[in-house]
Regions:
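Glycine-rich, highly charged phosphate/nucleotide-binding loops
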Residues: 57-78
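A short acidic, amphipathic alpha-helical/loop segment
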Residues: 100-104
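Short N-terminal targeting/anchoring amphipathic segment
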Residues: 76-97, 111-112
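Short acidic, glycine/proline-rich loop/turn micro-motifs
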Residues: 16-17, 53-55
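N-terminal subdomain of nucleotide-sugar transferases
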Residues: 1-48, 83, 111
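A conditional alpha-helix N-cap/helix-loop micro-motif detector
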Residues: 22, 65-69, 95
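Extended, alpha-helix-rich binding/interface surfaces that flank or overlap catalytic cores
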Residues: 47-51, 59
Length: 113
């Protein structure tokens, strides 16, 4: 069975409309994982970036991330085991764009992060 990888890029998703090096790297990593035989699903396009260091904005993003993680967990738990992710891959952790999804989802589904 091929690995099913939940891919997430909190700074900029590979599907983001604005070109950038981060978007290109995310796309290349997805392709590399697919070339290695993995099935890769974009877990979310949620962007947790706050460039100003605004405490209220960061708290709002954290709360939104917590809600999204809970929804992902519920959705994947409802799927047959063969359709759930077997690993979580986060590209580009950054203090201005933390991963509020991956650790919670990985722990809940007991998959590698």
């Amino acid at each position: 069975m091929a690995a099913r990888i939940a891919f997430y890029a909190p700074l900029k998703a590979p599907t983001h409309p604005t070109p950038s090096g981060d978007r290109q790297m995310a796309r290349l990593l997805v392709r590399a994982l697919q070339s290695a035989g993995a099935e890769v699903d974009l877990a979310s396009d949620f962007r947790s970036y706050d460039g100003r260091g605004d405490r209220q904005q960061q708290q709002a993003l954290q709360a939104e991330g917590r809600d999204l993680a809970a929804a992902l967990i519920d959705g994947w738990r409802d799927l047959p085991e063969g359709r759930r992710p077997t690993a979580w891959f986060t590209y580009h952790l950054y203090h201005k764009a933390p991963d509020w999804l991956g650790p919670a989802v990985s722990a809940a589904l007991a998959i590698p992060y």
